Amino acid sequence: MLNEFPIFDYEDIQLIPNKCVIKSRAEADTSVTLGNHTFKLPVVPANMQTILDENVAEQLAKGGYFYIMHRFDEAGRIPFIKRMHDQGLIASISVGVKDYEYDFVRQLKTDAPEYITIDIAHGHADSVISMIQHIKKELPDTFVIAGNVGTPEAVRELENAGADATKVGIGPGKVCITKVKTGFGTGGWQLAALRWCAKAARKPIIADGGIRTHGDIAKSIRFGASMIMIGSLFAGHIESPGKTIEVDGEQFKEYYGSASQYQKGAYKNVEGKRILLPAKGHLQDTLTEMEQDLQSAISYAGGRQVADLKHVDYVIVKNSIWNGDASH
């Protein structure tokens, strides 16, 4: 039962250092393998319209990073797969669970993407299980990610249906208001939910949402994530598709949730909101900084590679890691 587990989130945890065994953090290897491909970092930008478009996806793939293209340009998905494959790059797309998506999956047989993410807000659903089975039947070599979920039962059921990885996180994101609108979700205890789900998982877990700092990446790995999906930290870059808006002479980029009125175009089952983020520099600068911070984390763990973060001790500090530090 959940009540037997301690409940905590990212800001409640500090990882405990081990003796360093490398001469420089540059020796630490941040790469991670998911399916048949190895990527430079265990992070993936959220598959949201204000985070990435085809150009950003291409930039990420060329740089050796994992990406998941969003599903909100449905007609553009097959041309996108061709565009990526023509350049020798991996194709990674998203699908929903509506009836027409079944025909769409059949159309992919001639040029199957390497990765498909079944992407709905409440992924522990018969509709998702049915779609996993359909993709696995039609495209047996495609790596299927399914979500989002927040319980061990959901992880096991999606894995048993054929999912190659599950995405864990219901509403912990900065622009997700599922927790407020519905009363449900992993907001405020996302890291504990990840730990709970990871104990049941036999296949990779992608932690999705609630990441506010680069240190949260290391914490996610400690509690069982193979890959971490990140929204707000990847939003607001020069390359980001979100609109640039000027307020009092300052540049901001818009960032909105996948079920917001801005994305849906109407007040219809809205579970996302729009915020403005101060415009950042280039996406590559953030990726490089993430890599360096993760290398430092690996060195503090007394390790040489990402997996070494899984074995460190931790302490629950209940919101005290920011005490005396207003800079966060």
UniProtKB/Swiss-Prot annotation:
Keyword annotations of the record: NADP, Oxidoreductase
Superkingdom in the source lineage: Bacteria
Pfam families: IMPDH
Catalytic residues of the enzyme: C176 (thioimidate intermediate)
EC number: 1.7.1.7
Chain positions recorded as NADP(+) binding sites: 205-228
GO cellular component: cytosol; GMP reductase complex
Record's catalysed reaction(s): IMP + NH4(+) + NADP(+) = GMP + NADPH + 2 H(+)
GO molecular function: GMP reductase activity
Name of the protein this chain belongs to: GMP reductase
Organism for this UniProt entry: Streptococcus pneumoniae (strain Taiwan19F-14)
Gene that encodes it: guaC
